[in-house]
């Protein structure tokens, strides 16, 4: 597989993934299930910041479904780590487990360079 930086609207590079619940699928199969697919990369299921993002996606997932959209969330965590912590029904959307970071490499998703790099640009601004 070639590594390629993609932009909004580009055709995504297909890959095979395993969910925390023992299913194997491909991105190509997944995108056929809805009009729009949001491919989201977070790091580890145990990361507090990632947990906040996951909770927000779970709480707002019906809004995605209402627009014929879906989420495929890539986490650099082992399937068992996630399956032991949350059920498939509670999660609501599909997770692609990538403990070796191969998908992060494929899509050139690097780590944050600093703690500040993890924060939203909105942090610290008056609302």
Describe each PLM feature range.
Residues 27-57, 70:
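Short active-site neighborhood of thiol/selenol oxidoreductases, capturing the structured segment around
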Residues 5-8, 31-32, 40, 64, ...:
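Generic structural signal for beta-strand residues in well-ordered domains
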Residues 53-105:
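Structural microenvironment flanking redox-active thiols in thiol-disulfide oxidoreductases
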Residues 93, 98-125:
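Thiol/selenol-based redox catalytic cores and closely related redox-interacting motifs
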Residues 1-29, 52:
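N-terminal "domain-start" segment that seeds a small globular fold
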């Amino acid at each position: 597989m070639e590594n390629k930086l993609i932009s909004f609207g580009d055709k995504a590079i297909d890959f095979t993934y395993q969910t925390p619940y023992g299913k194997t699928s491909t991105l190509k199969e997944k995108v056929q299930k809805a009009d729009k697919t949001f491919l989201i990369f977070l790091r580890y299921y145990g990361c507090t910041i990632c947990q906040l993002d996951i909770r927000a996606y779970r709480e707002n997932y019906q809004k995605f479904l209402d627009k014929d959209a879906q989420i495929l969330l890539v986490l650099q965590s082992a399937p068992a780590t996630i399956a032991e912590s949350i059920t498939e029904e509670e999660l609501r959307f599909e997770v692609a487990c990538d403990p070796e970071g191969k998908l992060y490499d494929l899509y050139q998703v690097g780590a944050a360079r600093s703690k500040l790099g993890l924060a939203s640009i909105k942090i610290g601004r008056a609302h």
